[in-house]
Amino acid sequence: MNSFLDIHNTDRSDLRGMIDSARRMKDARSGQPKGTPDADLPLKNRMVALIFEKPSTRTRVSFDLGVRQMGGQTMVLSGKEMQLGHGETIADTARVLSRYVDLIMIRTFEEATLLEMAEYASVPVINGLTNRTHPCQVMADVMTFEEHRGPIAGKKVVWSGDGNNVCCSMIHAAGQFGYDFTFTGPPTLDPEREALDFARAQGVQAVIERDPAKAVEGADLVVTDTWVSMHDPQSARERRHNQLRPYQVNEALMAHAKPDALFMHCLPAHRDDEATSAVMDGPNSVIFDEAENRLHAQKAIMRWCLGL
């Protein structure tokens, strides 16, 4: 039994195996209707709990569809239904769910909630997102890059904007997949130091460059994410926009990267804030391939967790 809690504490050979498995499964489904079951039905007779303390579109749809394509069934539970840690303890919830399901995916706020769920569950647990990390998204990002440009090892990846949870996982992935990483953004929104230290310890460059034009020089991939959350008050939104406006990914910024540099955004996006529509809809944008690949990457992760 394997839980998928983060990229940095998963063996790199297993991570590579998941990417390769995801690509094989995607290729095997080419041209088929979305509801067509996979030929081998690896999750036949399996039940998967999908816990959403934090709501989501892509995570819910991609995990739900992935389980169905592999022949399994899902039980979707919202934060209001679960009341994680408010009443019944997380530890007891994990123990109870383990009696009902074969696999748990949890999308939650606090990293501690994920870790406690994994500690007490007797079935594998998948990190669907926490405030600190978003490893499923970055596995899809690596898969997407390699579909379009070949091996990501040795490439230069630049993150522009807020050093958030996706950024943290992308730094972890730099260490595991062997690419160099540059962050450009305001000092108040730097990514966590521990992530940068981890990547450097694996022998790759993980640097901060305040000048966005210098940061993207020679980049093979430029990535950004939304500047604000749906829960942010208006005052915080305005402050963040003022901080981050110099780091908008636009055509002028992309001109400093390699001519064939890809652009990614995990979506949802606030168009013409963190990235312009010209970039998002441009020839080097792979944002919708990236969104689709959440499905395939997560199917591979589920198979790995269950040893299938």
UniProtKB/Swiss-Prot annotation:
GO terms for biological process: arginine biosynthetic process via ornithine; citrulline biosynthetic process; L-arginine biosynthetic process. GO terms for cellular component: cytoplasm. L-ornithine binds at residues 165, 225, 229-230. InterPro entries: Asp/Orn_carbamoyltranf_P-bd, Asp/Orn_carbamoylTrfase, Asp/Orn_carbamoylTrfase_sf, Asp_carbamoyltransf_Asp/Orn-bd, Orn/put_carbamltrans, OTCase_ArgI. One of its GO terms (molecular function) is amino acid binding. Carbamoyl phosphate binds at residues 56-59, 83, 107, 134-137, 266-267, 294. The keyword Transferase applies. Gene3D superfamilies: Aspartate/ornithine carbamoyltransferase. Pfam families: OTCace, OTCace_N. Its main location: cytoplasm. It comes from the Bacteria. The keyword Ribosomal protein does not apply. Reversibly catalyzes the transfer of the carbamoyl group from carbamoyl phosphate (CP) to the N(epsilon) atom of ornithine (ORN) to produce L-citrulline. This is Ornithine carbamoyltransferase. It comes from Paracoccus denitrificans (strain Pd 1222). The gene is argF.
